[in-house]
Design a protein with these regions (language model features):
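Phosphate-binding loop of NTP-binding sites
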Residues: 1-146, 150-160, 214
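Adenine nucleotide phosphate-binding catalytic loops in nucleotide-utilizing enzymes
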Residues: 119-126, 140-141, 156-215
Length: 215
């Protein structure tokens, strides 16, 4: 996304007729080879949430392939090549990069004003996320923050399973009785569709990570 048409190296290979792919297009092509492809999107929290998903999948012995935007200690970098049908990646909206992906499941953490060097305004950002949802196949899974403004416009009429998380009691997954230790690490009671599913204790700080972990 950071390389534009005036980049001299890009211009040179295009002049020679050499095929090129953006990073997002390459990830999209890789994604097509996996039966279960999870794309984690949102203005904030993508790297943290992708890392949390990675840790859970590894703990479950599911041997996923991972592409994450930061260095993750458990995989010794930002890429892990697994041996299963599971692929998990961050999905960035900048330059509509995530519209090159082929996910079977999507996570949308939040939608706020960002990348205004590319998007005109928040409405254009929302439109991009709506187009992202449309890339899900029929029967796919959308996990989305119930607090997103005018949520129904993002979800649209897509024929997929929708699971919500957030502060609202009408969310499928929500946190109650949030408390913090002396290092600001939260714990909370996890409610799944109103039913108590146990106490969750996080090793990372801040309320925002309560909602990242719910996703």
């Amino acid at each position: 996304a950071a390389i534009h048409e005036d980049n001299p190296e890009l211009a040179a290979v295009q002049k020679r007729g050499i095929p090129t792919l953006t990073r997002a297009q390459l990830l999209g092509e890789i994604m097509r080879n996996y039966g279960q492809a999870v794309a984690v999107a949102g203005t904030h929290g993508k790297t943290t949430t992708t890392s949390m998903i990675t840790d859970m999948l590894l703990a479950a012995g599911l041997n996923p392939t991972i592409s994450v935007g930061g260095i993750l200690k458990d995989i010794g970098g930002n890429i892990r090549v697994g041996g299963s049908e599971l692929f998990v990646t961050e999905a960035c909206e900048y330059t509509n990069s995530f519209l090159s992906f082929y996910p079977t499941a999507e996570v949308i953490l939040n939608i706020e004003e960002d990348h205004l060097d590319f998007f005109k305004d928040i409405q254009e950002i929302r439109h991009s996320f709506g187009a992202f949802v449309k890339r899900l196949p029929d029967g796919g899974l959308l996990v989305i923050n119930s607090g997103i403004d005018r949520l129904e416009e993002i979800v649209g009429e897509k024929n997929c399973r929708v699971v919500t998380f957030g502060k609202g009691e009408d969310s499928d997954y929500t946190a109650k009785n949030i408390a913090y230790d002396e290092f600001a690490r939260p714990s909370y009671d996890l409610l799944i569709r109103g039913e108590d599913a146990g106490r969750v204790t996080l090793g990372v700080t801040g309320e925002h990570n309560v909602y990242n972990s719910l996703a």
